[in-house]
Amino acid sequence: MPYPIRSGSLDRRQALLGMTALALMPWRESKADTSEESATWLAKFPALERQFNDAMATLDEWGGQAQTSLSDYDALFEAVRSKAGAYWSEVKLSQPKRLVAYDQAYRSRAEIDFEHGAVIIETLDTHASTDALVELIKRTLSTPVDDPSVDQGQLSRKKRDGIQGLLKGQVVDQEGRNVRFAWRTDRYAKWLATHRVETERQANGKKVLKVNIPLSKNHLGVRAKQFMPSVEKASRHHKVDPALIMAIISTESSFNPYAVSHIPAFGLMQIVPRTAGKDVFHRVYKRTGMPSKTFLFDPRKNIDAGTAYLALLDTVYLKGIRNPKSRRWCVIAAYNGGAGNVFKAFGGGRSSALARINALSAQAVYQHLRTRHPAGETRRYVLKVGKAHQRFKPLV
């Protein structure tokens, strides 16, 4: 999402648990979505290949609807919650702006909070050696941007030369220096394991060793810069304001390429495969089906698909709105809550809603969406994206 299994050889709960690792730990797929290339790619990572075979056999047993069923997706998270809950009073799961990974025994976990700029490492192994904590810290800080499920031990020394992955340029050491090289990463990890380990007690009475690592103050901007080339390319291709694309990404995921929500939505622009993703596949890419999780966890593909959907909203679903600024506000609201709810906010029917929107100023349209849209989440979303858009306009 290890060995192949026959139908019925795993119970439903075990199969869900096996698939959960893939829901929470994505990998990058090859340029072409062919089974041959996927097989070649998977062969490089035996553990993932075994999980993939298990998952596919389970899907054969349940039927294809298991891939898109919200109840089954919720069950994936519930399976992890159950396993982790045996050890942790508070079970943490990945969210759009938070990446959480447990070790295989569920006794250690790492959390990257992309919104607030923090890395939190916890272990129930209170007798862990300093060296073990150092390695846990180093692995977390070196989470790669393309596949966080790959063991860092598989990577060459050259690729592990300092923090070159997801947190590149966002970690400063005890001296206030950017942690760029392997020797500095190692030294900082040792300092943290010696000076910043706290002992806490959970509600269930178990002790936890905890290390809090703050990210740099400009962590959001540093991550944003990583994805700027893809944003600019998608902007040119689909003729969408790059500042709006950046604002959407910032609001949806805080530039976390592995963002996942219970909807389920995936990746930087939080695309729902069975709605927006399917629409883009059919109308823009001229492909059947819908994007896979693998597709949407690829930052370039996610940005292009999300931008293509913004273009669809602008030029197809909301093209009857004459004022470009009014249309932009409606596009923002529709990206979150759908075009139908935008029309509902202005009276229900498409024709009457368009007439009412076109009779208002752009500021009045904004205020109406902020106060009269049927979904509170969308009302707040319009405000957040609007503010983010202003922040990114000078940068693109």
Language-model features: where?
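A short, structured beta-strand-centered segment in the mid-to-C-terminal lobe
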Residues: 291-301
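Short, solvent-exposed loop/turn and secondary-structure capping segments
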Residues: 258-261, 281, 344-348
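Short, functionally critical alpha-helical segments immediately adjacent to catalytic or ligand/cofactor-binding
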Residues: 239-263, 271-272, 306-307, 331-336, ...
